[in-house]
Amino acid sequence: YHACAFNCLYCQNYHFKKHTFSTKKITAKNLAGAVDKKTNCICYFGGDPTPQILHAIKTSKIAIKDADGRILRICWETNGAMQEPFLTMMADLSLKSGGCIKFDLKAWDPGIHHALCGVTNTKTIENFQTLAGWTKKRPQPPLLIASTLLVPGYVDEPEVSEIAGFISSLHPEIPYSLLAFYPQFYLNDLPTTSRSHALRCRDAAEKAGLRNVHIGNVHLLAEGY
């Protein structure tokens, strides 16, 4: 999906915004019709799927009905800032289909989050906490996953430690991915995440109590700072 409720300075899909007001449309029925017998997962991302969440919900319901009992997992990658009724709809679809919801927890400090994303992280934190309560309904495969982009100079060990401590207080088994940063959009003058930065953040997350921490985008890690 093209739109997003955030305006991140490092957005890797910033060019998607140009298509938000495109005259080219696709109905939920037609989008669901793209699912074939080889498809076992629909993952919505963007941008962010939540500005068009009703379209995504309708598409998912049609696709699941057409699958007629065949495995079709519904997954989401989101900033987590949706209203709670929509979160419930998303979670219900993922729970029943065997899918997951990945929250991008961009920063813990409100000032850093606002500087990087242009908005508060209050709703994201509230929704993550709410969804963590669903995890006991289906421990495996995990319903809730978290990730954080390691932006040099902004998102470092103290930030990761706070985020990880929050996640751990809800459930220490929630998977957490630390993603290497690549310069994009307005932050194209920053370096890629260094290997030492990523390793220090992984240690901080594990010390905060998380048991399932992963470093992603390893190929981007540099040997700098």
Model-based region annotation:
Residues 26-190:
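Conserved AdoMet/S-adenosylmethionine-binding subsite of the radical SAM
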Residues 1-10, 40:
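N-terminal pre-triad scaffold of radical SAM enzymes
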